[in-house]
C-alpha cells in the first residue's frame, strides 16, 4: 500500500488510504490519524471508524460527541481522541452496548471490524517487531501496535525466560493488562494471516520460508483452506496459531 505523507497536519480525501470508506469528492478534507500505534497507511481514525464503518453516528459532530463521552474503548482503554489510529487486531468495545469488534485484515477491503464476544475481546494477538535488552538485563518485546512487553530475567547473561520469543512471532496477550497467554513462532507449519499486499486477509499454513536479505526479501509459501498455494513476503505475515487460530476469524477464512 502506498505510503501517506506524514509531514502535514491535514489530509485531503483524495490522498486518504483507498480502504477508508469515505466519499472522495463529497468534501476536500478527511480526518488525519495522529501519530500513534499504527502508521497512517495501515490504520483508520477513530472518527471514521465510528461514523462510516460501524455506523454509530451520522455526522462528524455526533461521532466526536460519542468518542468524547468515553463510549469507545480500544484494547480495553477508553480513547477520547477522535484522531486515534485504529489498526490490525485492535479490539473495539462500544461501552454500554455490549458490542465488541476485532479489526481483521480482509481481502480487498484491507481492514474490517469483525464482531466478537466479550470473552474474545479480552485477548489480542500481536506480532513481535523486535526485541531489545533494557536496564537490568531484562528483555523488552516491541509489538506491531506500538506496545512493549517486558520479560524479566533472573540472569542477564543467560536470559532463558525470553529465548523462545523471536522477531515476527505472534504473541497472544490479555488487554489491557498485557499478560502473555500464548506464543506462535514465525516458522514453517504455523497458521498465519497476511496483513498487507495483494494477498491481504488470506489465511494459510506456512509451508516454506525462503530467507533473503531482510523481511521484504524473505519469501513465504503458504497454503490456504482451499488447498491453494500462494506467496507473500515475511513483512506481511502475521502468525496467529499453531494447530488452530488463537482468535476468531471471518467465516470461510479457515476451517
Swiss-Prot record:
GO BP annotations listed: translation
Top-level taxon of origin: Archaea
Family classification: Belongs to the eukaryotic ribosomal protein eS4 family.
A GO MF term: rRNA binding
SUPFAM superfamilies (UniProt xref): Alpha-L RNA-binding motif
Alphabetically ordered keywords of this record: Ribonucleoprotein, Ribosomal protein, RNA-binding, rRNA-binding
Organism: Ignicoccus hospitalis (strain KIN4/I / DSM 18386 / JCM 14125)
Any one GO CC term of the record: cytosolic small ribosomal subunit
The protein, known as: Small ribosomal subunit protein eS4
Limits of the S4 RNA-binding domain: 44-107
